[in-house]
């Protein structure tokens, strides 16, 4: 992420510090650019950022324990899905590194407002054919908690991630705790 932003600074001539960009992560990329006042250079910034992020993806290690935790949930029959603000190409590459089935994957689309709006979470629940009240959204940024609350989903803050725990949010300290949080029982087909 930082390498990709540094490439934007170098190649596009953007002076906005990485710290300012980082405070906004979790939102769709174009929303971040608008919040930073960079929407006029959006196409070029996005092109450089996305290309660099995809090229650097193999160098970014997964959070320790996440592969095992997701495999255990998958084996239990828990329906797994992803709602992210990352580009579809980067998301596809990342998910290909996991040996689990993700029943729904939601990335930013022009037709659907991104987090903190609830829509991507509602679409994910609909595609997975589960009630939002029986769903849990795990995220590491404040916009994740806002989106979950707006969607009527339980939110668990991933303490191993990037952002600070939002006030009042339940927190997981490590991926292994995903199996200990009282997730809804898998639904029969």
Which ranges hold each PLM region?
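Conserved short hydrophobic patches within well-ordered secondary structure
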Residues: 1, 49, 83, 94, ...
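N-terminal helical cap/lid subdomain that shapes the substrate entry/recognition surface
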Residues: 1-68, 72-76
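A structural signal for short, well-ordered beta-strand elements
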Residues: 14, 59, 84, 171-174
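Small/polar loops that bind or transfer phosphate-bearing groups
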Residues: 24, 82-83, 139-140
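Short, flexible loop segments at the rims of nucleotide/cofactor-binding pockets, characterized by
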Residues: 57-61, 83, 113
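Asp-based, Mg2+/Mn2+-dependent phosphohydrolase catalytic module
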Residues: 71-78, 87-189
């Amino acid at each position: 992420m930082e390498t990709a932003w540094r490439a934007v600074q170098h190649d596009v001539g953007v002076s906005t510090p990485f710290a300012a960009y980082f405070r906004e992560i979790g939102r769709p990329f174009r929303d971040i650019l608008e919040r930073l006042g960079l929407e006029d250079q959006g196409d070029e910034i996005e092109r450089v950022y996305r290309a660099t992020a995809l090229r650097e993806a193999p160098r970014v290690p997964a959070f320790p324990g996440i592969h095992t935790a997701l495999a255990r949930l998958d084996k239990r029959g828990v329906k797994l899905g992803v709602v992210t603000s990352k580009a579809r190409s980067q998301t596809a590459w990342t998910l290909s590194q996991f040996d689990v089935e993700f029943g729904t994957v939601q990335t930013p689309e022009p037709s659907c407002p991104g987090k903190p709006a609830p829509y991507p979470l509602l679409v994910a629940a609909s595609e997975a054919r589960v009630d939002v009240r029986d769903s849990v959204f795990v995220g590491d940024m404040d916009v994740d908690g806002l989106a979950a609350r707006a969607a009527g989903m339980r939110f668990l803050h991933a303490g191993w991630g990037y952002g600070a725990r939002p006030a009042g949010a339940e927190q997981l300290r490590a991926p292994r705790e995903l199996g200990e949080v009282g997730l809804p029982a898998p639904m029969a087909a």
